[in-house]
Amino acid sequence: MQPSEQPAARKKLTPVMRQYEDAKALHPDAILFFRMGDFYEMFNDDAVLVSRALNLTLTSRNKGEPDESPMAGVPHHAAHGYIARLLALGHKVAICEQCGDPSKIKGLVPRQVVRVVTPGLVTETEQLDARANHYLAAVDGGGAPRGDALGAGGPYGLSLLDLSTGELSATSVPDAATLLAELARADPREALIARDLPDVRAAAASLACRAALRDDEELDSAHVASILDDAAIEPISAAALAEHPLPAVRAAARALRFARRCSPGARIPVRRIAPHDTSGTLRIDETAQAHLELVRAADGGRRGTLLDVIDCTVTPGGARLLRRRLLSPLADLAGIRRRLDEVELFVSHPRARGELRQALGGVGDLERLSVRALLGEATPRDLGLLRDGLTAAPAAIAAVRSIPDLGKAAARSDDGAAARGKDGAAAGSSSGSEPLLAEAAALDVVADVCAELTAALIERPPPNTREGGIFREGYDKELDDARGVEKNATELILALEAKLRTQTGAPSLRVKYTRVFGWYIEVTRAHIAKVPETFRRKQTVATGERYTSDELDELADKIEHAGARALERETALFDRLRALVAKSEGRLRALARKLAAWDVAAALADVAHRNDYVRPHVTAGEALAIRDGRHPVVERYAAAGHFVPNDTRLDLSGERLWLITGPNMAGKSTLMRQVALIVVLAQMGSYVPAREAEIGLVDRILSRVGASDNVARGESTFMVEMRETAEILRDATRRSLVILDEIGRGTSTYDGLAIAWAVAEHLFDAIGCRALFATHYHELTELSARAPGIANYSVAAREHGDDVIFLHKLEAGPASRSYGVAVARLAGVPEGVLARARAILATLESGAALPGGKHASLRGRTRGGAAQLDLFAPAQAAVPPEQSAVIETLRAVDVDRLAPLDALRLVAKLKGLLGGGG
C-alpha cells in the first residue's frame, strides 16, 4: 500500500507499529516474530493464536487506548523451542529482526524479515531428527494443460529438498500413483504443489507430511534456469539441466524458489540436482510401507519396525542413508551386488569392522554441521563438533585400509557356490574391496580445516558467541591482550600504584575506584607537595586530594572496555573461522557421504553377524526361494530359540500363487510379511534372516494386510480393503510380489468368497505374479485343482483336549479346521458363550439348515431333511453362569502346588459359587 493510500487508522499507529504492519503485510500467512529488544513480540491475531497454541500470557499494547491491541512475547534466546512447537502444528513463522546495534542508532531501529521458517525448511539442530531427512517436496505438472482429476496422466515432476543437508533431487514420474508412492517414501514435512493439481494436493495432505501447500505462482519454463541460478549456491549449468526431464527441473525450480523467498538474501546450499530414477528402485507404496511397518509401527513409533532391527549405525548421516535405502531398495542387479559385496567385506573382517565403527562413533554429523556453517548458522559448539568429527575421520580410513589384502580380491561370482563360514561370507576376499580401497586411498579428510579448528577452539566451546570464551589462549595476540587486561586488572592497578609511588616518593599514594568517579589517585595532605604536574586534580577530600593522569586514564579505559573488546575480537575471529569452514563445505559433505556409506555397510554386517543372517543370492531369474526364513522383527522380540523358521518357494515357472489357510494366531500374516521383508532386505543390499535365500528381482511389493477404516474419508473397513485391493490389481506386474490377507471378510460370506475367488484368479491368470494369499475361505483351496501353479499350504496347529497348540510351521495342503472357538477361549470369552458356540458349530458342520431355509454349510450340497438349528433355543444348551464360574476357577488351579488347607478352602469357594451351603 502506498503512503498516500494509507487509511486514517494507520496514520494513528506509532512508528514501530507501522513497521510491524508493513512486515506483516508481506507475510500474511505466517506468524510474525517481531524483535523488540530481548523479546520477539506478536500482535493482534498472531498474539491470540500463539497464546492459545503455546499457552502464553496474552497482554495488550496501549491498554485502554483506542489503538489497544493484543500482544504476546517470547524471549529471543528461547525462541527456537517455541518456533519448533508452532511448526509441529503446521504454522509458518516469519522472523523480523532489528538491523544494526540499537545502542548506536538514534531514533527508530530498522527492522526486516530475515527468514520465514516453514515445516519443510528447518536447519536448527534441536528441531531436526538426526536420523532422518527433513524434506520439502515440490510437485509440478510439467507445464502441460491437464484436468483436475488425480487419475489424469503424467508426467509429474517431483523434487525433494533437504535444506539441512543441501540435498536436492528431482525426478519425473509417469502417473499419479507413482507420484504418491514416491511422496510416501520420502515422508516430506511439507509439500508444495502446483495450483493446477488440486487433487494431488488433497492426496498429499493425507500422507504423513505436515502440510500440503498450493504454489499459486506460475512457472515459466523459459525462466527456470534463471530461478535455479539465482537460488543455488553455485550456478547449475544448462548441460546439467539437460540431463533431467523438464517436469523434474520445473519441480526443482519450485522448491528452490520457495526456499529462497523464505530466506531472502541467502543462497540455498545446493550445488547440483541429483537424479532419482524411480525405475531403478523397488517400489513400495504407502500402504505396503504401513503394512510391513518398515520405519513406522502401527502406534506411530519406531519400536517394532524393520528399521529398529537393522539400524545400528553410529553416525547420523549413516542412519539417514540406511533409512533411504530401506525405503528405496534397488531393482538393479549390479547395484544390489555392489552393496552386498561391501557388507560381505565387513562381515568377513570383524576386527576392521569393529575399529571402523569405533572411529565412526566420534565423527558426528559432518554433513549438517558443514551446511550450517555455509548458511552462517553454525555456533561455536557446532564448529567444535565438526573439529571432533574431522579428528576421528583418519582413524576410520585407517580401519578400512587395515583389511588384509584389500584391493587384491578376485571377482567373485554371485552363485552362492563358494564355501561359507559362520557369518555366511564367501571364502576369500570380496570384490567389494576394490572400490573400497580406491575410496580409502583418495578420500580427502579436510586436514587443513581440522588443523585450524584444533588450533583455534577450546576443548568444549560454548553454545553461542554471547559470552565469549571460544578460542584457545595463544591463538590470537590481540584477543590475548584484551583478555589479559580483563583478567589481571587488579595486578595492573597495583603495578601502576607501585610505579607512581616510586616516581613521586609519596608512600601514601593509593589508586582507588568508586562508581561515581571511576579510577583515581589519592594522596594524603602530608605528601601533596610531591605530586607531579602531570597529575590532574579531580576532588578535594578531608584527608587529601584525588587526581588522575593520562597513564591512569589509559589503563582505566583498557580495564573498562577489555571485556567488550575481547568479545568483539572473538566475534570477528569466529566469523572468519566459520567462513573458512563454509568455503570447504563441498569437501566436508563429500567426506561425510563416504563415511555414511561405510557406516551403513559396517552396520549391516554387524547385524548379520549378531543375528545369523546370510548373504542372499539375488538374480534376474523368476524364483523366490527362502530356506528357513525368519521374520526379522518378530524374531527380535521372541524368546531365544522360540521363533519357528519356514521355507518358501514361489516361482513364475512353477508354484507362483500360494493359498494359505489356518487358524488365527497361527502365523499366516507373520509368514507373508516375513517373505516381503526378506525381499526388501535383499534388494536394499543387506543380508537376510534365513539359512539360504534366492531372490529373483522384484519390481514392487503390494500388500493388503490387516483391518482398518478411514473415518475422515467416510470409508468403512471393507471399503478400505476393496480400495487397496483395487490398487494392487491395477499396479501389479508379472515381476511384483503380492501379499493378501483375508480378502472379502468385511461383507457377507457369499459376497466375500466371490470377491476373494475372483481376485485370486485375476492374480494368477491376468497378472501372473508371485503372490501369497491367506484366507479363511476353505472353498478357495479348490482353486489348486485347476492349475499346477496354485498351491495350498497351511500353518499347523494341534488340539490337546479343549486347547489348541499353534506350531507356526508351514505344511503342504489346506488346513482342516480354523480353531476359532479355541482362539476365542484363549482370548477370555466366557465359558457359557464358548459352550453355546460349540453347539452351533457342531450343527453347522453337520449340514443343518439355518432359520429361513438357508443351508448352514457352504460345503453342503443338499437342503432337505436337515434339522433346523434354533438360534433362540432355551438356555439348556449353554452352561449356566454359576457353573461357568466354577469351571474357570478350576482351570486356574495349579494342583501340584495346592496345599491341603488351600484345597479345603477351594472346595468351600466352589460350593458357594454353586449356591451350596458352606
From Swiss-Prot:
Protein name: DNA mismatch repair protein MutS
Biological function: This protein is involved in the repair of mismatches in DNA. It is possible that it carries out the mismatch recognition step. This protein has a weak ATPase activity.
SUPFAM superfamilies reported in the protein's UniProt record: DNA repair protein MutS, domain I, DNA repair protein MutS, domain II, DNA repair protein MutS, domain III, P-loop containing nucleoside triphosphate hydrolases
Family: Belongs to the DNA mismatch repair MutS family.
Positions of ATP binding: 662-669
GO BP, sorted A to Z: mismatch repair
Family matches, as PANTHER family: DNA MISMATCH REPAIR PROTEIN MSH1, MITOCHONDRIAL, DNA MISMATCH REPAIR PROTEIN MUTS FAMILY MEMBER
Keywords assigned by UniProt, alphabetized: ATP-binding, DNA damage, DNA repair, DNA-binding, Nucleotide-binding
